[in-house]
Every structure is written in structure tokens, then in C-alpha cells.
């Protein structure tokens, strides 16, 4: 399947829960993540677009450049951000290229409810330490 260029505002306007955003950078840290994970990308986020909320991006990052929509605070770890702001930050501030992959199929109300439970459970959770990861 061949990709098509889409303006960020158009991508945000058509965003649906379950869509995936992929990011690829060139910094030393980005390349390290790509190498360790054996992946061509170094960051992934999932769209959360429910009811009357603006489209959001649920992802985890070391930075705290944007306020978390769930807590209202700037935090590290698992975060929920306005989709447009998050993608713009990753492209402009962090120098990442971004790709969007739309979910095929439908999300039912029960899926949305479970997603909200998971977000409530994990939002704000920090990354494990390197020794903690090594112990697993």
C-alpha cells in the first residue's frame, strides 16, 4: 500500500480512535531506540477521539513539553495530549517525521469504555528504570 501526503489539519480532522501515529527521528537517542527495538520508528502514539472531545494522542515520552489532558499537568511517562499539538511538537521541536495509519474496522462503545479505564490506570505512569528493565 502506497502512502499519501496529508496536511496535519486534515489528518486531525479525520482522526478516529485506534489510529496510530509513528515517528522517526535522527538524533542519537532516536537511533538508539530504533536499534534496541529493531524498529524503523522510535515513537508511537494512538489516537483517542471520543464523543465531543478533540482528537487526542495517547503515548509515553521522557519529555514533558505539553500539558496532559487527563491530569492538567506537564509530566513524564504515559500522557494524553491534544493530537495536533503532540504531532506538531514531535515534528517541530523534536525533528521527527510523522506517519499516520488509520484503523480499519470499527470501535464499539465497550472498546471506548475499556480504553478510558486503561487510560485512567496508566496515565502519568513513568518509565521503568534501566535496572528495572534489565531485571525483567
Specify the residue positions occupied by each region the protein language model found.
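Cysteine-nucleophile amide-bond enzymes
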Residues: 1-136
Amino acid at each position: 500500500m502506497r502512502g499519501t501526503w496529508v496536511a496535519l489539519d486534515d489528518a486531525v480532522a479525520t482522526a478516529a480512535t485506534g489510529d496510530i501515529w509513528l515517528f522517526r527521528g535522527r538524533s542519537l537517542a532516536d537511533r538508539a531506540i530504533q536499534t534496541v527495538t529493531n524498529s524503523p520508528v522510535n515513537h508511537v502514539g494512538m489516537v483517542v477521539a471520543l464523543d465531543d472531545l478533540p482528537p487526542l494522542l495517547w503515548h509515553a515520552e521522557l519529555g514533558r513539553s505539553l500539558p496532559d489532558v487527563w491530569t492538567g499537568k506537564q509530566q513524564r511517562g504515559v500522557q494524553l495530549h491534544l493530537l495536533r499539538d503532540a504531532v506538531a511538537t514531535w515534528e517541530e521541536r523534536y525533528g521527527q517525521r510523522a506517519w499516520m495509519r488509520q484503523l480499519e474496522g470499527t470501535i464499539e462503545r465497550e472498546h471506548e469504555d475499556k480504553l478510558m479505564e486503561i487510560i485512567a490506570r496508566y496515565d502519568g505512569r513513568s518509565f521503568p528504570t534501566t535496572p528495572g528493565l534489565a531485571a525483567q
